[in-house]
Amino acid sequence: MGKVNKTDREWQRELSPEEYRITRQKGTEPAFTGQYWNTKQHGTYVCRCCGAELFSSDAKYDSGCGWPSFFRPLNGSVIDEHEDLTHGMVRTEIVCHDCEAHLGHVFEDGPQPTGLRYCVNSASLQLKTQEKNDEETYP
């Protein structure tokens, strides 16, 4: 998949107000409220904005933080990192490589084998599950 370039107006038409606030304006959903924070379903988490495959449920774990947490992305080229100095903190923001949607942040307090915690807003994701007939579905 190549780079996705859309105007703010196009994103506003395609996303819910909450999805737009989080993915395009770098917002954060309240902890323990997002659709996927406690989901145990198996599948692939894709970018809500462009559909790029980002994380496998095999890398998801319960970090106790209230947001979906993963110890690694599907591969190193699907997510870009940027320094985030907002809110009086120094953090590393993670964005979708293809459309630059704000996903969340990555922290160095995760489990092995990476020691990383990709803390992601549910509104930035969509879970693509596998049905018994192996066809991909979006719940």
UniProtKB/Swiss-Prot annotation:
Catalysed reactions, semicolon-separated: L-methionyl-[protein] + [thioredoxin]-disulfide + H2O = L-methionyl-(R)-S-oxide-[protein] + [thioredoxin]-dithiol
UniProt entry keywords in alphabetical sequence: Metal-binding, Oxidoreductase, Zinc
Binding-site residues, Zn(2+): C47, C50, C96, C99
Active-site residue numbers: C119
Enzyme Commission numbers on file: 1.8.4.12
GO BP of this protein: protein repair; response to oxidative stress
Pfam families for this protein: SelR (PF01641)
InterPro entries the UniProt entry points to: Met_Sox_Rdtase_MsrB, Met_Sox_Rdtase_MsrB_dom, Mss4-like_sf
Cofactor annotation: Zn(2+)
Domain of life according to the entry: Bacteria
Domain MsrB: 8-130
GO CC terms in record: cytoplasm
SUPFAM superfamilies found in the cross-reference section: Mss4-like
One MF annotation (Gene Ontology) recorded for this entry: peptide-methionine (R)-S-oxide reductase activity
Cofactor note: Binds 1 zinc ion per subunit. The zinc ion is important for the structural integrity of the protein.
Protein family according to the UniProt entry: Belongs to the MsrB Met sulfoxide reductase family.
Listed name of the protein: Peptide methionine sulfoxide reductase MsrB
Species annotation: Acinetobacter baumannii (strain ATCC 17978 / DSM 105126 / CIP 53.77 / LMG 1025 / NCDC KC755 / 5377)
